[in-house]
Amino acid sequence: MKLVVCSESDTAGQNIKDNLLTFADFEEKDVGEFKLYLSDEFYIAETKERLIYADHIDEKLAKYIDFEEILFASRHSSKDGRKIFTVHVSGNVGTADFGGKPYSLAKPSPQTMKNYVLALRERLDRKPEFEFTMEVTHHGPSEISKPSAFYEIGSTEEEWKDREAAEVVAEAMLDAIRAEKMDWNVAVGVGGTHYAPRQTEIMLTTTFTFGHNFAKYTFEHLTAEFLVKAVKLSEAEYIIIDEKSVNSAVKKIVNEAAEVAGVEVLKSKKVKKDFRLV
């Protein structure tokens, strides 16, 4: 069973939740600090705390319900005000400025992320002013042992309140919850900017999905040991590098990590060429 988690104070998360509640019959329960909505297909949990500070929320919720995976329904904030749908895994490569713990990573859910992205792609024409983009690993919670990812609407109050945008996200989430295909190629991504354009293209057009992704701005904190940890948490078989932003020092770290973890290193250009979706 998959669990959607939203925050009481998150406008976009509430908007997505309200749409999800129209897709099935739910039993409502108040337990501890949570409000639960239980259906035969999936569960929803609402918390009072901000999601980025929700470390160990999987352990807290496991006292009341059985579930295998978390989909965090959330807002995305940025100063540029872009209209975007985003997806990413949480965790910190370095300091913990926005929740979680330093140098700590949540366990990703790459298969569900991929199924969500493909379902979302089919609906983007309903909101042509929006674009989809991956984000790299950032912010809390980092202390999540169940597979999880963030599914976000950005980037201002206007988009968070957009009913149709939330409807598109909720429908894609439901498709991902129902999806049976769980054998996509899984990689950890290294390189690029925060919005990871090459990883985004790979998610949309190839047979690959991602667990953790590390932007160029995190390279000063990236070690082979940390990268091995990310590969294992992601259950990845590959590391994909954005070859235009990875220097020789980082390539050395990547190759060392790949040897220890027993995975293959691929360049993003090769992946886009050789692993296209049919």
UniProtKB/Swiss-Prot annotation:
Q: Which InterPro entries match?
A: Deacylase_DtdA_archaea, DtdA
As one GO molecular function, the record gives: D-aminoacyl-tRNA deacylase activity
Name the cofactor(s). Answer: Zn(2+)
Q: Tell me one GO biological process term.
A: D-amino acid catabolic process
The highest taxon in the source lineage is Archaea
Which Enzyme Commission number(s) are listed? 3.1.1.96
Does the keyword section mention rRNA processing?
no
What remark does the entry make about the cofactor? Binds 2 Zn(2+) ions per subunit.
Q: Name one matching Pfam family.
A: tRNA_deacylase
Alphabetized, the UniProt keywords read: Hydrolase, Metal-binding, Zinc
Its recorded reaction(s) are: a D-aminoacyl-tRNA + H2O = a tRNA + a D-alpha-amino acid + H(+); glycyl-tRNA(Ala) + H2O = tRNA(Ala) + glycine + H(+)
Q: Which family does it belong to?
A: Belongs to the DtdA deacylase family.
Q: Which PANTHER family match?
A: D-AMINOACYL-TRNA DEACYLASE
Q: Quaternary arrangement and interactors, per the entry?
A: Monomer.
Job of this protein: D-aminoacyl-tRNA deacylase with broad substrate specificity. By recycling D-aminoacyl-tRNA to D-amino acids and free tRNA molecules, this enzyme counteracts the toxicity associated with the formation of D-aminoacyl-tRNA entities in vivo.
- Protein name from the UniProt record: D-aminoacyl-tRNA deacylase
